[in-house]
């Protein structure tokens, strides 16, 4: 057969779908009970979509196609996200001829040179990639209703008005507030950064350090060394301080409010602190070695403690000043032990080694399972020898911190007897009230780089607008909604619950980037994770909005709060529709239609996206829905998918290790790409794209096409007499239907592909082997029937070639709208399946005997099936599942008593193997029917149950495990 022209077939059916408007649902066609509304996070248009994105968008398309075939009225719309700073940042970098950016867009995304330089204008980037993304989705065969297409920002005024309405609504509820809050900040551009504005480090947490002001008296001056800690309660156990002798530190005037103090911190810390409500005036810079050997006073205990050298102190983490609590911090304990061995370092700084030798650890916390100094014990338990054992040290630290926080009891007055969790808060609060401690925010990991290419800092912003996700009443409603939602996979539910718990105020607007201006404060632009939470509701009316725009009958400015309130939040009212019609110029009937559309399609049945959006978009989606819509309109389910890698490596545009979705389609065909990414892993697991494997799959898909094309020429005559192997094939087809259906209902795409494609293909291969040489009406009936079912099972995964094959089969209309196969009751036949499994197993056993026994030129095999009494034992054991009960029952039978010892051994064996589900078959009948096939497969003569006991094997025969002698 000539190589299949995937592209020609794809273009043919994409054109036909578009012409027939197959995927534009009419709400009047089916009752609300038969509607199915599924959406996926719309793509951000800063570049081409890659094969990782392909997974995210193919999953909902497969589910949409499956539900459509099940008879549902399916809405699967698509829009485009262009809000925020990233696109503006790209334009800026192209304008500045940034080599890395130029490389990505010219060499990785293959943007023609003459178009690339137009990208200095962000709108040109949007225009180019919006067109490219839509073409990619069409080429992929996505069953999208394109009449509802839109994009975000003020560049699309109707949607912008919708977002204004959303924010007015939230503000009226007290959920959008103004105030001071910590945010990730680009210090060069001067803007807050949301998750989508971060190029590297978007998952990095912000930590809240307590900085405790240790006192250095020098030349009549009081200078503070603020030590940063996540465990303020351990200030009572400080034995020394750590500074990095090679790092640069500064002495600076630090002003906060009406207070001015002298601080010594790392140079990096001084810069970062300047963004956190402090004025910093650097007086001098010096190396940390200048302070080594000096003493500072603990502001809580009054103890004088020495400053010791430590290269492990990172000047770019918090203040660069670290307090040492060796009884409860494994790093501190091991650093002191190392220092005791390296006396030359101490002598370098004129420190008497005995000072370090005589440091006494201070025990603060009682912890079950540990003695006085848990850090020492844990380091010993994990075999930590020195600071070089970094992984073990980090594990020891995690173990101790976690155990002490959750189970530790404080021993030091005035907090003796209280849990560490409580003491931590009390100590921090008391120190801050006394002015001896403050808060500093720091990233848990580095680097955090904005999409402008700049290192981010944490800034305290005043007069910033926030969505108050910390509101307790709002959190309660979000939890209620989540509890009533289906989450796939269910294991992700705990992550959603945790995010709801820790979510707090989130900056929702910034001063730069594309977007919708905040309606009451237009200097601010609503950011990308805040204008993308309820657009699924907008899809329900966007067809009408788009039609009005097309006809020049829409004045978007007139789409005010009253209009959207009526559509989305109020009961039907003819009077209201008339008033709104007069106000907006939109016909009252159209307004009524819009409301009908929303009420029909909502609630959203499924929201799909990748797992990285759980801590932001997907949880914001829940919050905003419960705030704005009636409970009956709250979303019903979220499906979360994993990521993709390329040839075992994480995809990276900058390293060129990326495969564009459209290139994958060009290389392999859309159907092959779809089937490959759906069959590689379950939707919630990560997958790895391997070109070699895709090539193999292409050949299998071509074989599928070839087989069905041949079967399409057969006639399926009714009333034919089927043989057992024919019944087996139809039974297995039933199993494939059942398995694929169940898997798709649960978004288990890999399992669905296994059933719909590989299982049918493998079963068909076996059937063709078993029926080789036959060309009768029964076989033709089975193969023609199989083709009809198989094409429909494959339609959600490989829609283009399935349409082509459906046409060859003479199917009615589009296979995309054909009924999804259902198991045929009369096809079920567990007996023929058991018999066929028996035959397969026997063939493999005989092959193994020949190989293991090294029998050269075998001539014949003698097969002995189990006697009736052994089957009786199997049946009784299956019923009783207990040795004594089974033995008692069987010994009632005189025939069984003749085999007493053998019965006893057999019962023991069956119970040990838990062989309780053995299905009885007529083994001899199955063997005689398959005798010719077995002989052909093995190339030897088969003799079934002869009188003579060749090789004394007869007694070894067991139910479903015949005894075999080969000669």
Swiss-Prot record:
Name the domain of life: Archaea
Q: Where is this motif: 'HIGH' region?
A: 43-53
Subcellular compartments: Cytoplasm
**GO BP terms:** leucyl-tRNA aminoacylation
Gene Ontology CC terms, in alphabetical order? cytoplasm
| Annotated motif 'KMSKS' region, positions | 650-654
The EC designation for this entry is 6.1.1.4
Q: What is its main location?
A: cytoplasm
The answer, when asked if Ligase is one of the entry's keywords, is: yes
Q: Which GO terms describe its molecular function?
A: aminoacyl-tRNA deacylase activity; ATP binding; leucine-tRNA ligase activity
Q: Which residues bind ATP?
A: 653
* Keywords tagged on the record: Aminoacyl-tRNA synthetase, ATP-binding, Cytoplasm, Ligase, Nucleotide-binding, Protein biosynthesis
- Give one Pfam family: Anticodon_1
The record, for NCBIfam families, names: leuS_arch (TIGR00395), PRK12300.1 (NF008957)
Question: Hey, which family's this protein in?
Answer: Belongs to the class-I aminoacyl-tRNA synthetase family.
Q: What is this protein called?
A: Leucine--tRNA ligase
What is the organism field in this record?
Answer: Thermococcus kodakarensis (strain ATCC BAA-918 / JCM 12380 / KOD1) (Pyrococcus kodakaraensis (strain KOD1))
Q: What does UniProt list as this organism's lineage?
A: Archaea, Methanobacteriati, Methanobacteriota, Thermococci, Thermococcales
Instruction: From the UniProt record, report the name of the gene that encodes this protein.
Output: leuS
């Amino acid at each position: 057969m000539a190589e299949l022209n995937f592209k020609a077939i794809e273009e043919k059916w994409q054109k036909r779908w578009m012409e027939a408007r197959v995927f534009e649902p009419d709400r009047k066609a089916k009752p609300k009970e038969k509607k199915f509304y599924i959406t996926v996070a719309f793509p951000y248009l800063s570049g081409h979509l890659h094969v990782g994105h392909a997974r995210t968008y193919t999953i909902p398309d497969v589910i949409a196609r499956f539900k459509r075939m099940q008879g549902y009225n399916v809405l699967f719309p698509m829009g485009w996200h262009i809000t925020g700073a990233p696109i503006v940042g790209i334009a800026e970098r192209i304008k500045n001829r940034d080599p890395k950016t130029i490389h990505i867009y010219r060499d990785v995304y293959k943007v023609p040179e003459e178009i690339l330089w137009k990208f200095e204008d962000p709108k040109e980037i949007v225009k180019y990639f919006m067109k490219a993304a839509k073409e990619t989705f069409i080429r992929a065969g996505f069953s999208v209703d394109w009449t509802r297409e839109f994009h975000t920002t003020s560049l699309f005024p109707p949607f912008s008005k919708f977002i204004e309405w959303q924010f007015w609504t939230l503000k009226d509820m007290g959920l959008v507030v103004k105030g001071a809050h910590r945010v990730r900040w680009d210090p060069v551009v001067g803007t807050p950064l949301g998750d989508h504005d971060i190029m590297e480090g978007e998952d990095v947490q912000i930590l809240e350090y307590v900085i405790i002001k240790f006192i250095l008296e020098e030349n009549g001056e009081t200078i503070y060394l603020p030590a940063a800690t996540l465990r303020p309660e351990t200030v009572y156990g400080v034995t020394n301080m750590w500074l990095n002798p090679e790092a640069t530190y500064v002495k600076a005037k630090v002003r906060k409010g009406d207070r001015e103090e002298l601080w010594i911190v790392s140079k990096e810390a001084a810069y970062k602190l300047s963004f956190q409500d402090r004025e910093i005036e650097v007086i001098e810079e010096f190396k940390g070695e200048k302070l080594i050997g000096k003493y500072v006073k603990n502001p809580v205990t009054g103890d004088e403690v020495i400053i010791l050298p430590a290269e492990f102190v990172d000047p770019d983490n918090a203040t660069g000043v670290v307090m040492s609590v060796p009884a409860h911090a494994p790093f501190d304990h091991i650093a002191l032990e190392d220092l005791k061995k390296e006396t030359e370092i101490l002598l370098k700084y004129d420190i008497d080694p005995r000072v370090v030798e005589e440091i006494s650890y201070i025990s603060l916390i009682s912890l079950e399972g540990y003695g006085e100094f848990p850090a020492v014990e844990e380091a010993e338990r994990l075999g930590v020898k020195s600071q070089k054992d970094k992984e073990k040290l980090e594990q020891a630290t995690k173990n101790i911190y976690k155990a002490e926080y959750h189970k530790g009891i404080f021993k030091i007055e005035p907090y003796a007897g209280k849990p560490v969790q409580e003491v931590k808060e009390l100590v921090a609060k008391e120190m801050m009230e006394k002015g001896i401690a403050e808060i500093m925010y720091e990233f848990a990991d580095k680097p955090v780089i904005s999409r402008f290419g700049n290192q981010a800092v944490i800034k305290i912003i005043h007069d910033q607008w926030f969505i108050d996700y910390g509101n307790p009443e709002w959190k309660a409603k979000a939890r209620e909604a989540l509890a009533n939602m289906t989450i796939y996979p269910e294991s992700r539910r705990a992550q959603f619950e945790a995010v709801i718990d820790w979510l707090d105020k989130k900056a929702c607007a910034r001063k730069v980037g594309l977007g919708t201006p905040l309606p009451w404060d237009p200097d601010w632009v609503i950011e990308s994770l805040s204008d993308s939470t309820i657009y699924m509701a907008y899809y329900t009316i966007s067809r009408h909005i788009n039609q009005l725009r097309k006809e020049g009958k829409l004045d978007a400015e007139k789409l005010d709060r009253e209009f959207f309130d009526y559509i989305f939040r109020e009961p039907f009212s003819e009077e209201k529709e008339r008033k709104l019609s007069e106000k907006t110029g939109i016909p009252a009937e159209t307004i009524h239609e819009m409301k009908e559309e929303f009420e029909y399609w909502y609630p959203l049945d499924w929201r799909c996206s990748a797992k990285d959006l759980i801590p932001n978009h997907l949880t914001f989606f829940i919050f905003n829905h419960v705030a704005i819509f009636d409970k009956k309109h709250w979303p019903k389910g979220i499906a979360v998918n994993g990521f993709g890698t390329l040839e075992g490596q994480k995809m990276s545009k900058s390293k060129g290790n990326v495969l564009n979705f459209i290139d994958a389609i060009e290389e392999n065909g859309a159907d092959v790409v779809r089937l490959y990414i759906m069959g590689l892993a379950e939707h919630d697991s990560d997958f790895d794209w391997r070109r070699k494997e895709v090539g193999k799959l292409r050949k299998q898909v071509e074989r599928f096409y070839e087989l069905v094309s041949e079967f399409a020429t057969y006639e399926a005559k009714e009333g034919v007499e089927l043989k057992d192997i024919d019944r087996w094939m139809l039974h297995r087809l039933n199993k494939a239907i059942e398995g694929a259906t169940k898997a798709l209902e649960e978004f288990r795409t890999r399992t669905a592909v296994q059933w719909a494609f590989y299982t049918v293909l493998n079963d068909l291969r076996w059937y063709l082997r078993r029926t080789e040489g036959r060309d009768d009406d029964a076989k033709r009936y089975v193969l023609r029937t199989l083709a009809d079912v198989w094409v429909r099972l494959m339609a959600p995964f490989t829609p283009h070639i399935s349409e082509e094959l459906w046409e060859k089969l003479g199917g009615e209309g589009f296979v995309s709208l054909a009924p999804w196969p259902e198991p045929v009751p009369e096809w079920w036949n567990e007996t023929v399946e058991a018999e066929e499994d028996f035959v397969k197993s026997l063939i493999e056993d005989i092959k193994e005997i020949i190989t293991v026994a090294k029998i050269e030129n075998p001539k014949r095999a003698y097969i002995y099936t189990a006697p009736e009494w052994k089957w009786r034992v199997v049946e009784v054991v299956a019923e009783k599942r207990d040795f004594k009960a089974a033995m008692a029952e069987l010994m009632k039978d005189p025939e069984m008593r003749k085999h007493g010892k053998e019965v006893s051994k057999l019962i023991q064996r069956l119970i040990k193997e838990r062989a309780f589900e053995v299905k009885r078959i007529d083994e001899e009948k199955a063997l005689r029917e398959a005798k010719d096939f077995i002989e052909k497969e093995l190339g030897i003569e088969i003799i079934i149950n002869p009188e003579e006991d060749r090789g004394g094997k007869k007694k070894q025969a067991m139910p479903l495990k015949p005894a075999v002698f080969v000669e």
